[in-house]
Amino acid sequence: MSNLQAIIEAAFEKRAEITPKTVDAETHAAIEEVIEGLDSGKYRVAEKIAGEWVTHQWLKKAVLLSFRINDNQIIDGAETKYYDKVALKFADYTEERFTEEGFRVVPSATVRKGAYISKNCVLMPSYVNIGAYVGEGTMVDTWATVGSCAQIGKNVHLSGGVGIGGVLEPLQANPTIIGDNCFIGARSEVVEGVIVEDGCVISMGVFIGQSTKIYDRETGEIHYGRVPAGSVVVSGSLPSKCGKYSLYCAVIVKKVDAKTLGKVGINELLRSIEE
C-alpha cells in the first residue's frame, strides 16, 4: 500500500469527522493529489488487469472524501453561475490547452474536475461526473450522462440521452464500465456497476442493472451484471414461472466479431434482427 493510499484509507475511516474546517493538511493534500491524478488520467478508478476489470476502491474513497473537504463556491459558467463543492474541469483551460489535449467540447457540456477526457473525444451538451474516464475517440452525445467513476472505453458512441450510472448516490461497490468499440443506443441506461464488454451494440431504450436478466436467445443462458463481448442487445421480456405475466429483460439477439462490427453499420445490425 502506497503512502498516498494509506492516508486516504485512514481518512475514510473517520470521514464523518472531516469537514472543510477540520481536515488536516496532509489529508487535504492527499485528496487533492488523487483528484488531480484522476483529472489528468494518471489514476483510474477501474482498469483492466490481466483481462479482468479491477476496481481501486481507495480512489473511489478519495472522490467521496473530496465532498467532505470543500465548501460550496461560486463557479462562473458562460452566461450563468453555479454554486457547488466541485470545480469545473475546464474553468482555467486556455485555447492552447484545449488544442494540446485534443478533444472538442460543445457549449453547455459540463465536466467536473477529476474526470478525464481522452484525445479525439467529442462532448456534445452532456454531463461527465467526477472520477469518470472517457476513452480516446469517444462521442458523448446530447443529454448523455457519464456517472461518477464510470469507465468508458475507446471509440464508444453514447447516443442522445444515454445514462451511465455512477457510484456515489446511491453508493455502489464498483463503477459501471463500457468497453472499447461499443455503441449505446438513445435513452438506454446502464447502471449499478454493470460491465458491457468490448464490441457490444445496445439498441435504443435498453435498461440494464445488476438485477436485469440478460437473455441469450441462441443458448438460453441468462447473464446478470455483464454483457458478453460482441453482443447485440435489444429490450424484451421473459414469461414468469406461472405463465400469467412477463417481466422485462435485455435480449442478446446475436453476436458479432470486431471484423463484422467494423464492416457493418449499426443500423444494419439492428434492422437485420429476425423476430
From Swiss-Prot:
Pathway: Amino-acid biosynthesis; L-lysine biosynthesis via DAP pathway; LL-2,6-diaminopimelate from (S)-tetrahydrodipicolinate (succinylase route): step 1/3. It catalyses: (S)-2,3,4,5-tetrahydrodipicolinate + succinyl-CoA + H2O = (S)-2-succinylamino-6-oxoheptanedioate + CoA. It is found in: Cytoplasm. GO terms for biological process: diaminopimelate biosynthetic process; lysine biosynthetic process via diaminopimelate. Substrate binds at R104, D141. Its EC number is 2.3.1.117. SUPFAM superfamilies: Trimeric LpxA-like enzymes (SSF51161). It comes from the Bacteria. Pfam families: Hexapep_2 (PF14602), THDPS_N_2 (PF14805). Its main location: cytoplasm. PANTHER family: 2,3,4,5-TETRAHYDROPYRIDINE-2,6-DICARBOXYLATE N-SUCCINYLTRANSFERASE, MOLYBDENUM COFACTOR GUANYLYLTRANSFERASE. Homotrimer. This is 2,3,4,5-tetrahydropyridine-2,6-dicarboxylate N-succinyltransferase. It comes from Haemophilus influenzae (strain 86-028NP). The gene is dapD.
